[in-house]
């Protein structure tokens, strides 16, 4: 039983190599999906979150089919390792996105893990009751616009200093 999702093909591989093999990869994805459905926001290495995102979106699509659909129930039973989360998928998450086609998750990069400097990310279902994630600041002093503004300010201050200096010397009579 496989959940088919298109992925970028890279020299014959259609998915990332995670874990110890294909079975380990599936177990890892199932555990991540279960955690996401339970908590509606999880933190994990960026590659795992990016790989899991498509499966999380597809799981909501199956949830929207309803709990009377046999295929949807089989998919929910396979991907959710904790069976008490199956009603949450069909009764809480699927109705939340009934008018939305795709884009159920939000993924944000967070600072790297301190031990091994692994690139980390947070994935969450949109519309959850958790406090919103802070947006990253994009107005760094290194952006092109801020560099240009800084140069303009320096030019203006230099021209003002030059004009002040010339007017000051013109006003004071020579002794």
From Swiss-Prot:
Family matches, as Pfam families: Ribosomal_L17
Keywords: Mitochondrion, Ribonucleoprotein, Ribosomal protein, Transit peptide
GO biological process assignments: translation
Gene3D superfamilies xref list: Ribosomal protein L17
Transit peptide limits: 1-8
Biased composition (Polar residues): 157-175
GO terms of molecular function: protein domain specific binding; structural constituent of ribosome
Subunit structure: Component of the mitochondrial ribosome large subunit (39S) which comprises a 16S rRNA and about 50 distinct proteins.
Family per similarity comment: Belongs to the bacterial ribosomal protein bL17 family.
Protein name: Large ribosomal subunit protein bL17m
Organism encoding this protein: Pongo abelii (Sumatran orangutan)
């Amino acid at each position: 039983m496989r959940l088919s999702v298109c992925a970028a093909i890279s020299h014959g591989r259609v998915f990332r190599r995670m874990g110890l093999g294909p079975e380990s990869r599936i177990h890892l994805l199932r555990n991540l999906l279960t955690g996401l459905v339970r908590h509606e926001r999880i933190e994990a290495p960026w590659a795992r979150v990016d790989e899991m995102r498509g499966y999380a979106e597809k799981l909501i699509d199956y949830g929207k089919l309803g709990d009377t659909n046999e295929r949807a129930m089989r998919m929910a039973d396979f991907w959710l390792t904790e069976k008490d989360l199956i009603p949450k998928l069909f009764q809480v998450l699927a109705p939340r996105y009934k008018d939305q086609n795709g884009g159920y998750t939000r993924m944000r990069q967070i600072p790297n893990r301190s031990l091994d400097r692994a690139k980390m990310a947070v994935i969450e279902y949109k519309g959850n009751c958790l406090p919103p994630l802070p947006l990253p600041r994009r107005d760094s002093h290194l952006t092109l616009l801020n560099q240009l503004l800084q140069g303009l300010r320096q030019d203006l201050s230099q021209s003002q200093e030059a004009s002040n200096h010339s007017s000051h010397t013109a006003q004071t009579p020579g002794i």
